[in-house]
Design a protein with these regions (language model features):
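A generic structural signal for ordered alpha-helices
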Residues: 6, 23-24, 74
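Core segments of cupin and vicinal oxygen chelate
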Residues: 10-62
Length: 99
């Protein structure tokens, strides 16, 4: 049984916009904001009331981070009134939310 979560990842289309939203609008704290020699940016934030939870804001691959067919499936479910869809990719469950 999982009783506590210490790390999770959000794939974001723009890390600067994600920073603006999570830090400046929601009041999250920045844990790490470092750019590696290869240009990869490692950006993690923590909710103000959960200092033990670290969220990695990963840059999404491509235009939005999802393959076209996955987006079609998600849109189909959203059109049916589903707010989020759990998709299982290999052994990993990913919760996709779109508004």
């Amino acid at each position: 049984m999982i009783t506590k979560l210490s790390h999770t990842s959000f794939f974001v289309s723009d890390q600067n916009k994600a920073y603006e939203f999570y830090v400046n609008k929601l009041g999250f704290k920045v844990n790490t904001d470092a750019t590696m020699e290869n240009g990869f940016r490692w950006l993690t934030v923590t909710p103000p009331d959960q200092p033990d939870l670290e969220i990695v804001l990963f840059p999404a691959a491509g235009s939005n981070g999802f393959e076209e067919e996955v987006n079609k499936a998600l849109n189909f479910l959203l059109e049916k009134g589903v707010m989020g869809a759990a998709l299982f990719i290999l052994w990993t469950a990913v919760l996709l939310m779109k508004n």
